[in-house]
């Protein structure tokens, strides 16, 4: 599958807000479409133009309480629930990082992954991300992973 990116539309945001992930990934469910429109989100489409994922960068991708670091681009991304766990995470994250690099020209890229989400950590690791630390919010713990661009 190849991915194309576009600015997120209102219809895209409504679709994403309707996506439901199986446990324990339900924390990625997003009930509020307006949240996506208030920030700079991008929709990812497949070859047929179907919405298959989304991504965001910088402040929009940064977990609450995590400080901005000069030269570091925070990246957030999500695949449609029916496309998770089937080997698309690596190619998707690779293309998201390429888009982030093209738009923001960072020195490093950082992803913040819920500590229980071993699947996403393995995807990031396979793309050269290394664990750099941890971050904790009142709701959960996260693993910080980064790589040079």
What are these regions (language model features)?
Residues 110-121, 138-139:
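Conserved beta-strand-loop-alpha-helix junction that forms the acyl-donor binding cleft
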Residues 39-41, 139-144:
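Short hydrophobic/aromatic beta-strand or adjacent loop that forms the aromatic wall/cage
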Residues 1-3:
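Extreme N-terminal starter segment of soluble prokaryotic enzymes
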Residues 7, 14, 18-82, 99, ...:
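Acetyl-CoA-dependent GNAT
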Residues 125-135:
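Conserved acetyl-CoA-binding loop of GNAT-fold acetyltransferases
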Residues 85-99, 122-126:
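Conserved acetyl-CoA-binding loop-helix of GNAT-fold acetyltransferases
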Residues 58, 110-112, 132:
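Solvent-exposed beta-strand sheet faces enriched in polar/charged residues
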Residues 74-78, 110-112, 144:
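Conserved beta-strand segments that form the floor/walls of ligand-binding pockets within enzyme
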């Amino acid at each position: 599958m190849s991915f194309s990116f576009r600015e997120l539309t209102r219809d895209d945001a409504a679709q994403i807000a309707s996506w439901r992930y199986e446990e324990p990934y339900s924390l990625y469910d997003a009930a509020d479409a307006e949240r996506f429109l208030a920030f700079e989100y991008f929709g990812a489409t497949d070859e047929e133009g179907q919405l298959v994922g989304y991504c965001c960068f910088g402040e929009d991708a940064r977990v609450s309480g995590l400080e901005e670091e000069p030269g570091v681009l925070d990246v957030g991304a999500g695949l449609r629930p029916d496309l998770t766990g089937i080997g698309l995470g690596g190619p998707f994250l690779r293309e998201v990082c390429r888009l982030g690099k093209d738009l923001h020209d960072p020195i490093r890229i950082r992803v913040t992954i819920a500590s229980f989400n071993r699947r996403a950590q393995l995807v990031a690791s396979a793309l050269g991300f290394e664990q750099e630390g941890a971050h904790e919010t009142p709701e959960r713990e996260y693993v910080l992973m980064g790589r040079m661009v």
